[in-house]
């Protein structure tokens, strides 16, 4: 019996580490590369906040720091890929539907500039496409950097904290995993 107690205590910290790894990876890749278009970033953030509020071994400060870093560096990678490869990076995907979305994102960027980088964080697909568009359009690096910091904080930290504080609403805490699953499944289906 002591053997099972020992194994259980040795693996008790894997849950939070796995959560950090999954959330950080999804946030980074959704922000960094075109195949990230299909990842459910916002629902993952909200769900991670819900889980952090209900699990004592998940450190909300560590989670928020990881999310900010993953979102920030993900967008930086997207920007650099756009800067290096230009429009050809965006043309790799020949899907007519995706090309239509890319054109809309380019118009959004041309119209809104700095704010498009911040606002894009809150719009699925657009958050993946605007950084390489900004890079390909030769947006000044420090301008992008500032918008990226604001966007990563507002989106990554903001949505995660919304999930975290939602768990304090009576009745929500008992259904945290069902709610988290609903948000993740809903974003995958849509």
Regions found by a protein language model. Give the residues of each.
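Small-residue-rich segments of transmembrane alpha-helices in multi-pass membrane proteins
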Residues: 44-56, 154-155
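Re-entrant/interfacial helical elements at transmembrane boundaries that shape
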Residues: 36-50, 129-137, 163
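Membrane-interfacial helix-loop-helix
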Residues: 1-25, 50-132, 136-143, 168-183, ...
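Hydrophobic alpha-helical transmembrane bundles that constitute the permease/transmembrane domains
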Residues: 125-129, 149, 153-156
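Central hydrophobic cores of alpha-helical transmembrane segments
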Residues: 41-42, 148-150
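Transmembrane alpha-helix interface/packing and boundary motifs in multi-pass membrane proteins
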Residues: 24-45, 120
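Membrane-embedded alpha-helical segments of multi-pass transporters/permeases
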Residues: 35, 76-80, 157-160
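Transmembrane alpha-helical segments of integral membrane proteins
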Residues: 154-167
